[in-house]
């Protein structure tokens, strides 16, 4: 899980979603998991 100020899609499988006001990136590649905070 990478925590960054701005989350970006890395590949075409990445999806940007909001959970409880937190912006997250979920992907089939676990290295691409990110959250904003």
From Swiss-Prot:
PROSITE patterns: RIBOSOMAL_L36 (PS00828)
Top-level lineage group: Bacteria
GO annotation, cellular component aspect: cytoplasm; ribonucleoprotein complex; ribosome
Keywords for this protein: Ribonucleoprotein, Ribosomal protein
InterPro entries for the chain: Ribosomal_bL36, Ribosomal_bL36_sp
Ribonucleoprotein recorded as keyword: yes
UniProt entry tagged with the keyword Ribosomal protein: yes
Protein's GO biological process: translation
Entry GO MF terms: structural constituent of ribosome
Pfam families attached to this UniProt entry: Ribosomal_L36
Signal peptide: none
Family label: Belongs to the bacterial ribosomal protein bL36 family.
PANTHER family cross-referenced by the UniProt entry: 50S RIBOSOMAL PROTEIN L36, CHLOROPLASTIC, LARGE RIBOSOMAL SUBUNIT PROTEIN BL36C
Database matches in HAMAP family: Ribosomal_bL36
Entry protein name: Large ribosomal subunit protein bL36
Species the sequence originates in: Paracidovorax citrulli (strain AAC00-1)
């Amino acid at each position: 899980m990478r925590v960054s100020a701005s989350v970006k899609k890395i590949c075409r499988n990445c999806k940007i979603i909001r959970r409880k006001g937190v912006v997250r990136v979920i992907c089939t590649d676990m290295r691409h998991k990110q959250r904003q905070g």
